[in-house]
Amino acid sequence: MIKWPWKAQEITQNEDWPWDDALAIPLLVNLTAQEQARLIALAERFLQQKRLVALQGFELDSLKSARIALIFCLPILELGIEWLDGFHEVLIYPAPFVVDDEWEDDIGLVHSQRVVQSGQSWQQGPIILNWLDIQDSFDASGFNLIIHEVAHKLDMRNGDRASGIPFIPLRDVAGWEHDLHAAMNNIQDEIDLVGESAASIDAYAATDPAECFAVLSEYFFSAPELFAPRFPALWQRFCQFYRQDPSQRLRVSAAEGDYGEESEH
């Protein structure tokens, strides 16, 4: 169990969130003006409904809080804020943190060990993050701690535990499961060939279906060019679930950039 510190900094309500500055990160640059406006509206509600709690000397400010809220709401931009029900606090450490972890082996023996975690989430309870990895989530690299933990929360809306199959129509479950496992096997094949550190997709995706869904959700929003062409069938399922197409956003943004360059000549 994690013992929460008695002294923690909580972000207070702020009428003047710096949304323009908060949006100025690579992860969000391809959103249309309309999408940005709707994302801000969701983020404002998020900050009204959730407490951001800074731990172990970490200090929150309005810009940090606004960016955290925007990234939390990106996956539910088309789903609605109610998809983030089930937790009321976001606990933020300054760096990856140590927790006591218990696990049961194949013969039923329970083991305990201390492990370093970047983030944690449960069906009911807070989401725990760390600022170092949150900062690394601003870019478009395929890594995004916040989206990873949000994906677990969305996954757990479909049952007591994360399974890799979010709340989708029953008729789509078998196809989703088939395509997700095919992606896991493909990622594992690459790991076997080149090693974990050289794999083009985070090797954590091959560990189990829940982690595959969470990791690929990171790529879905922050590196669609690595996800969409490699797993096109699964990509379409993610587009249907999230009701977004980041790959299309990327293409439109690139085309507008090319047009702008031509206009300058």
Curated annotation (Swiss-Prot):
CDD domains tied to this protein: Peptidase_M90_mtfA
Cofactor(s) of this protein: Zn(2+)
Pfam families, sorted: Peptidase_M90
Subcellular locations according to the entry: Cytoplasm
Manner of cofactor binding, per the entry note: Binds 1 zinc ion per subunit.
Keyword terms, alphabetized: Aminopeptidase, Cytoplasm, Hydrolase, Metal-binding, Metalloprotease, Protease, Zinc
Protein family membership: Belongs to the MtfA family.
Summary of subunit composition and partner proteins: Interacts with Mlc.
Role according to the record: Involved in the modulation of the activity of the glucose-phosphotransferase system (glucose-PTS). Interacts with the transcriptional repressor Mlc, preventing its interaction with DNA and leading to the modulation of expression of genes regulated by Mlc, including ptsG, which encodes the PTS system glucose-specific EIICB component.
Protein name listed in UniProt: Mlc titration factor A
Source lineage: Bacteria, Pseudomonadati, Pseudomonadota, Gammaproteobacteria, Enterobacterales
Originating gene: mtfA
